[in-house]
């Protein structure tokens, strides 16, 4: 008599975790960090149509890595959740924590109850109301519904270790926008494989066409989300000589 296949609950959870982690690691990296005037999103993303970074609500932003169709479903659901809560109660009742908790509950349920987990990792960013001194807040939500709040930066997707190391070495809380962009791009360039025809010792170069950049700007009175592209972004990118040492001082010359 053939015995039925059996796997322990622990083994099933380990297999699901491994599947999700591998799917996330195959994607390109995203860096989210706080800077002097709000929150900066920098994603390695050559697509102009399929965004990894998005607005959720007035003072809330969203970034994700992994399978696009899965995190796009989450993004849309988050926007609907925020709109319904703001319409039913008050716009001030729509907070990053409430959205992060909703995402965590959804991902946790999918991870434990569905045959396949979502291969995604997301970040919900929030800045204070216009004119307030409330610090920005970052919430990281992983594939299994785990949630963590961060005060400085979040790195997701791809090869994160060298990117995290570069960020820890040079990050400062009071960076201006240009310095923050250069720091994030310089860190991203340390993450991925070397381009074809180059040695591993040669750093990668990410230009405007390979980046998706946006901010939550606390100086904007209502809708704080703004994309940065084209010549405005090109002026902020680090020069090849500067990529080896990202600026450690927000006021350092380029």
UniProtKB/Swiss-Prot annotation:
Oligomeric form and interacting partners: The 20S proteasome core is composed of 14 alpha and 14 beta subunits that assemble into four stacked heptameric rings, resulting in a barrel-shaped structure. The two inner rings, each composed of seven catalytic beta subunits, are sandwiched by two outer rings, each composed of seven alpha subunits. The catalytic chamber with the active sites is on the inside of the barrel. Has a gated structure, the ends of the cylinder being occluded by the N-termini of the alpha-subunits. Is capped by the proteasome-associated ATPase, ARC.
Gene name of the record: prcA
Family to which the UniProt record says this protein belongs: Belongs to the peptidase T1A family.
Keywords, alphabetical: Cytoplasm, Proteasome
GO biological process, one term: proteasomal protein catabolic process
Domain of life: Bacteria
Subcellular location: Cytoplasm
Control of this protein's activity: The formation of the proteasomal ATPase ARC-20S proteasome complex, likely via the docking of the C-termini of ARC into the intersubunit pockets in the alpha-rings, may trigger opening of the gate for substrate entry. Interconversion between the open-gate and close-gate conformations leads to a dynamic regulation of the 20S proteasome proteolysis activity.
Entry protein name: Proteasome subunit alpha
Cellular compartments per GO CC: cytoplasm; proteasome core complex, alpha-subunit complex
Keyword GTP-binding recorded: no
Role, per record: Component of the proteasome core, a large protease complex with broad specificity involved in protein degradation.
Pfam family, one: Proteasome
Residue ranges of the region described as Disordered: 234-254
Organism phylogeny: Bacteria, Bacillati, Actinomycetota, Actinomycetes, Mycobacteriales
GO MF entry, a single one: threonine-type endopeptidase activity
InterPro entries: Ntn_hydrolases_N (IPR029055), Proteasome_alpha-type (IPR023332), Proteasome_asu_bac (IPR022296), Proteasome_sua/b (IPR001353)
Organism this protein belongs to: Rhodococcus erythropolis (strain PR4 / NBRC 100887)
Keyword field contains Cytoplasm: yes
Annotated pathway: Protein degradation; proteasomal Pup-dependent pathway
């Amino acid at each position: 008599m053939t015995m039925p296949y059996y796997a322990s609950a622990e083994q099933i959870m380990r297999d699901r975790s491994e599947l999700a982690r591998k799917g996330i690691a195959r994607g390109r990296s995203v860096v989210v960090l706080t800077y002097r005037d709000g929150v900066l999103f920098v994603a390695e993303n050559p697509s102009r149509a399929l965004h990894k970074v998005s607005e959720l609500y007035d003072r809330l932003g969203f970034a994700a890595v992994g399978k696009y169709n899965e995190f796009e479903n989450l993004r849309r659901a988050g926007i609907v959740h925020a709109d319904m809560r703001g319409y039913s109660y008050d716009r001030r009742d729509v907070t990053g924590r409430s959205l992060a908790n909703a995402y965590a509950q959804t991902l946790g349920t999918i991870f434990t109850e569905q045959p396949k987990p979502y291969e995604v990792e997301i970040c919900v960013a929030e800045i204070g109301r216009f004119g307030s001194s409330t610090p920005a807040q970052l919430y990281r939500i992983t594939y299994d519904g785990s949630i963590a709040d961060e005060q400085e930066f979040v790195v997701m997707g791809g090869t994160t270790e060298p990117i995290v190391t570069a960020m820890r070495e040079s990050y400062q809380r009071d960076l201006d926008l240009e310095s923050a962009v250069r720091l994030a791009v310089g860190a991203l360039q340390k993450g991925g494989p070397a381009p074809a025809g180059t040695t591993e010792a040669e750093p990668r170069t990410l230009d405007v066409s390979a980046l998706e950049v946006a901010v939550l700007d606390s100086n904007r009175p209502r809708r704080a989300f703004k994309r940065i592209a084209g010549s405005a972004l090109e002026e902020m990118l680090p020069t090849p000589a500067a990529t080896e040492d990202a600026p450690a001082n927000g006021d350092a010359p380029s």
